[in-house]
Amino acid sequence: DLGEGSVNFKWASEKLMANNKVIYRGQPVAAIAAIDRHVAEEAARKILVEYEVLDSVTNVVDAMKENAPIILEDLIGDDLGEKIHNTNMSEHIRHDFGDVEKSMEDSDHIFEGEFNMEMVHQGYIEPHNATAVWNEDDQIKIWTSTQGAFPARTQIAGILQVNVSQVKVTPLEIGGGFGGKIPVYFEPIAAILSKKSGRPVKMVMERTAIFETTGPTPGGKIKVKLGVNNDMKINSAISEIWFEAGANPGGMIGPAAMCIYAPYNIPNMRIDAWDILVNKPKIAAYRAPGS
C-alpha cells in the first residue's frame, strides 16, 4: 500500500514520455543532455518527428460518446465493479444514503441545475525544475521543486524500476505550487540522462511547456437535483459528477464525491462520479484535491 504516493507506474512513465502514441499536446517524445542550453536546443532542432494526426476528445461529453476515439487501448474501466473495455471511462463510483427516490417525491420543491467547468492551471510563478545525479553506486539524488518529497520518491523509484532506498529526494523551497507540484514530470528523465552522461543533469521547464504538459484542475460537468421542504431544509439530493482525468486515469472524483454536500446535513443522497480520459495533461490538485 503506497498511500498518497500510489500510482500506476506504466501510465506514469508514458505520461512523461510518449510511447508509440502522443496522447496530449506537448507530450515529450525525446530528451537531450548537453553541456549547455544552447547546444541542447540546437540538437533538439535536428530531431525530426513524423506525426499521424488522430482524432481527439477534449471534454467529458465527447469522450463518453459511443464512437469516441479511445485514448488508452489497454484501459479497463471500473463501472461500479463491472469491468469495461474499449472505453474512456476509468472509474464510476457511487455513494448512497437513505431513500433517495421516496424522499425526492415527498419534497415540497425540486431544484435542478447543471454546472460546466473548464480546466484551470494553478499558475505558480516558479517553473518546474530539477537536478539529478545518478551515482556509480546506483544511488540517485534529486533536488526538485516539489510539494511532496515522499510521493515523488515513490513515483521516481517506480518509473525507474529501482528500489525506493536508492532514491533520495531533496525538496527545495518552492515559488508557488497550490497542489500542482505534487506529481513528478521530468525528474526521472533527468535521472536517466545523468546515468547516460555520467554527469549531474539540471532541467527547467519553460512556461509554455508548463501550461501544455503539467496538471491543471479538472474540467467537467456536474448535475444536481435537490428536494427541498417548505422549511427550506434540503431533504434529498442527487448528483452526477463527470471529471476530466487527463490522458491518464486517476482524477479527483473520490474527494469530489465525498465533499460535494459536506457543508450540509442531508438525510438522503445519491452521488455518482465518473473519471473520464480526455486528450489533455494528467490533472493535479488545485488548492485542494477535488475542490
What is the predicted function of each stretch?
Residues S165-L172, G198-T208, N235-E240, I266:
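Beta-strand segments within the central parallel beta-sheet cores of soluble alpha/beta enzyme folds
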Residues F115, W134-E136, T144-T146, P171-E173, ...:
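Short, structured patches in soluble enzyme cores that scaffold and shape functional sites
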Residues N8-A40, G180-N230, I283-S291:
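Glycine-rich and small/hydrophobic secondary-structure elements
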Residues T146-A149, E173-G177, M205-G215, E240-A245, ...:
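Acidic, glycine-rich active-site loops and adjacent beta-strand->loop/helix elements
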Residues D1-I84, I110-G113:
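Flexible, low-hydrophobicity surface segments
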Residues S6-A12, E82-A130, K221-S291:
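Glycine-rich loop/linker segments at domain edges
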Residues D1, A30-Y51, A130-S197, F243, ...:
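Alpha-helical support elements that line or immediately flank enzyme active sites
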Residues H38, A44-D55, A68, F97, ...:
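Structural signal for hydrophobic packing residues in well-ordered secondary-structure cores
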